[in-house]
């Protein structure tokens, strides 16, 4: 599924070279639920961006479903992202003027899926997160937890190989956070591969496996 070997990434900040990743190596198997945990500045966001094909490493190799990611152009990476990866963000990233179902539909429009099929798949995705009854509502008419459910439905609608969630409970209260984590557990039980980025130990421990990152290095892989 995900095979990363000795990844390194350096950024220039003014005149200073900052090593965001330092020969990081990890393997994530199909259908796993894995958390990547680390403090601010640990390199977890850089690792997430590379796993999500939003950035490329300076050195090392990354294979996603057997594809050598570093060999692809930016346009090809965009196609891989849209086909293989569903993203869930801390800030939901919903378009305010679009209804819940229209937000969920967007990735399918990009894929040029026929309208009738789009409608069926959008409905099914919203049902999976328990929000079909709010399909016509705008984001401003939904609670934070409901907006995150819409974001999860949007991630699911393309049937991706990988769900990549970046601090998905970061803006939510404890009760709503539990509800969102329950959805991730249900999705994992249904066979989805989930990688969850977090700084919260309590959230990280809910995954089947926790990968700890510090100063750009994988320091521990805990069951």
Task: Report each predicted region and the residues it spans.
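ABC family nucleotide-binding domain
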Residues: 2-214
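Generic detector of intrinsically disordered, low-complexity segments in short proteins
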Residues: 43, 222-223
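Conserved switch/coupling elements of ABC/ABC-like ATPase nucleotide-binding domains
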Residues: 215-221
